[in-house]
Amino acid sequence: QIQNNVIHQAYLNDVEKLLFLGSTCIYPKNAPQPMPEDCLLTDTLEYTNEPYAIAKIAGIKMCESYNLQYGTNFISVMPTNLYGPNDNFDLEKSHVLPALIRKIHCAKLLNEKKYDEVVKDLSLNSIEEAKAYLAKFGVDESKVEIWGTGKPRREFLYSEDMADACVFLLE
């Protein structure tokens, strides 16, 4: 509902250009890799993302319809996986890149025997507790286990580069 209101108010208030941020989850679950833009709406969405994806698709289509019907200049952009300042690096809840960065950082500290820094970084009480915790995520002083099959292709974009791209598109 919020995006509908924003898009409609942009039209009513003669906004010169509107940038709508979509999401890569709008593409089908079994889209080919690398993913071409034109595969939108060609197959089933990932079930766990479906409500969010449908809402994003509705926003994209609403912008497209306003452009056709009213001559607006509403553009849609689908950013890829973003990372950067203020990201979530929690090993239990973060996305793939922040988790990988944190795992490598902790493994490096372990390898360099900087145990106080590891304990502090993880907000735990002892190095034994920290090592046991990190082991759950495949991290020790000699290796970092990277989860998954290695088959999915992923793209990452630094958040400040995305911000620059948005400004560029609006100019």
State the predicted function of each range.
Residues 2-10, 62-63, 165, 169:
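Hydrophobic positions on the long internal alpha-helix
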Residues 4-50, 75, 88:
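Conserved Rossmann-fold NAD(P)-dependent oxidoreductase catalytic core, especially the SDR/UDP-sugar
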Residues 3, 56, 93-97:
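A structural signal for well-ordered alpha-helical scaffolds and beta->alpha junctions
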Residues 32-38, 64-168:
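NAD(P)-dependent short-chain dehydrogenase/reductase
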